[in-house]
Design a protein with these regions (language model features):
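Secretory targeting signals
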Residues: 1-7, 62-138, 159-240, 279-289
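Short helix-to-coil transition segments within interhelical loops
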Residues: 148-154
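Residues that define the loop-to-transmembrane-helix transition and helix capping
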Residues: 155, 244-245
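Hydrophobic transmembrane alpha-helix segments characteristic of membrane transport
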Residues: 138-145
């Protein structure tokens, strides 16, 4: 029952969502005028006194309370309008757009940190499991004739096993990412894929001012390529250790351990490990440390 009662934050968010989704897109004079008129309306409400209005002090307080959530939501939207106008005027082009940010914050990895790290950890476990087994099994089963054949034969075997592990990792990556993306798409209106990524205040420091779609694509490519690096590194470790169990344990400690440490509340490890590439939003925002 408690979950069905909207909180202050929920109501404020709904008003912010209303203002942004109603006006999102390229900035126009009409949109600027609309927001200025709303700002004036709220200023009048919160500057009311019994002397300058036909309301009593009690009625004024009641009216201000009734508009509290709408005013808070509008203020958040208006600050975004000012941000966009300032950036566009500074560049002399109407490039940045009004965008309802919340859904994109989840897609970029700016929110729900622990949930995101769990998803990445599942992908890392899949990468390590597949990579430690494909060659490790050869050693465990003493299939040494395959590994001691010729240099060309060893290379072909390694590449074949590497391809298998890449494929398994890619499939798991898709199975983890697609439901997460669909969940966000189902909960938030994402209608500005072509807008510049710096249109959003939380992504205003992006080192590449590409489209939002391009930014999301870059994040996914960074994650997948990093997972492939983990696969390759794990297989190389397997060649050295010649034991699938030891390879899996050490690889999980090397690549999964930092994710668990960051999940546990030590954010600095993000910048000192592959976490920064597996979760590349901070790097793309120019945050190296």
């Amino acid at each position: 029952v408690g979950n069905s009662i909207p909180t202050y934050r929920d109501i404020k968010e709904e008003y912010y969502k209303f203002y942004m989704t109603d006006q999102q897109g390229k900035m126009t004079e009409e949109k600027v005028e609309y927001f200025n008129e709303e700002r004036k309306r709220f200023e009048e409400i919160y500057s009311m006194t019994p002397e300058n209005s036909d309301l009593t002090a009690v009625e004024i307080v009641q009216k201000q309370e009734e508009n509290k959530y709408a005013h808070e939501g509008f203020s958040e939207a208006y600050s975004q309008v000012m941000y966009i106008m300032s950036n566009n005027q500074g560049k002399g082009v109407n490039e940045q757009e009004l965008v309802y940010e919340k859904g994109y914050q989840l897609l970029f990895g700016d929110k729900a940190v622990k949930e995101r790290l769990i998803g990445i950890l599942l992908c890392v476990i899949a990468a390590v499991y597949s990579a430690s087994g494909v060659l490790g099994t050869e050693y465990d089963l003493k299939v040494m004739n395959l590994l001691r054949s010729t240099k060309r034969g060893r290379k072909e075997l390694f590449l074949k096993k590497l391809g298998v592990s890449f494929g398994i990792t890619a499939v798991i990556f898709v199975l983890v990412k697609i439901p997460a993306i669909l969940k966000v798409v189902g909960e938030y209106p994402l209608e500005c894929w072509g807008a510049k990524v710096r249109s959003m205040m939380f992504a205003g420091q992006s080192v590449i001012n590409c489209s939002i779609f391009g930014y999301v694509l870059m994040l996914m490519i960074m994650q997948l390529v990093t997972l492939f690096v983990i696969v390759f590194s794990t297989m190389a470790l397997s060649v050295v250790l010649k034991d699938s169990t030891m390879t899996m344990i050490l690889s999980l400690l090397l690549f999964g351990g930092p994710l668990l440490i960051e999940w546990g509340g030590v954010p600095i490890v993000h910048y000192l490990s592959l976490n920064s590439l597996l979760d590349g939003h901070q790097i793309l925002q120019g945050n190296w440390l």
